[in-house]
């Protein structure tokens, strides 16, 4: 129906420590770095458009190891998208090293309906109210203020 250049794959390589141990939903991988880099090689050979990396986003979660970001960029020629606890500063740092192409701001977008404008103008962000996320009501979704 559509070409490979319109297909992307999302990974959630939830490294639990910077020594790259991984435990997720009862699964344990002996070498998550090698596993995901090999998968990226295969996807690169197929010519897909992008890989999206969903990083762990809980408050004390570790960052992806820089060696993983570096090796993913060396391995995969398409676009790389990162998401999970991104700030403007973190996105700029990762981008300055050439590791990624696009950066997602999920929760900040919920709390800041004008997020692109705030980023452009260097304005502060509204704080996310975690207790209202995914609650089924309008509180926390349509009541965050726009910047003035």
Task: Please describe what each predicted stretch is.
Residues 1-148:
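Flavin-dependent oxidoreductase catalytic cores
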């Amino acid at each position: 129906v559509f070409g490979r250049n319109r297909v992307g794959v999302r990974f959630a390589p939830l490294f639990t420590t910077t020594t790259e141990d991984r435990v997720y939903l009862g699964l344990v991988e002996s070498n998550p770095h090698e596993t995901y880099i090999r998968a990226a090689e295969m996807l690169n050979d197929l010519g897909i458009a992008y890989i999206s990396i969903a990083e762990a986003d809980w408050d004390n979660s570790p960052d992806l190891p820089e060696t993983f970001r570096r090796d993913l960029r060396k391995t995969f020629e398409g676009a790389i998208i990162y998401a999970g606890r991104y700030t403007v500063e973190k996105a700029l740092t990762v981008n300055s090293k050439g590791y990624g192409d696009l950066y997602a701001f999920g929760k900040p977008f919920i709390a800041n309906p004008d997020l692109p404008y705030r980023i452009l103008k260097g304005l502060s962000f509204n704080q996310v109210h975690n207790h209202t996320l995914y609650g089924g009501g309008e509180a926390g979704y349509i009541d965050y203020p726009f910047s003035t």
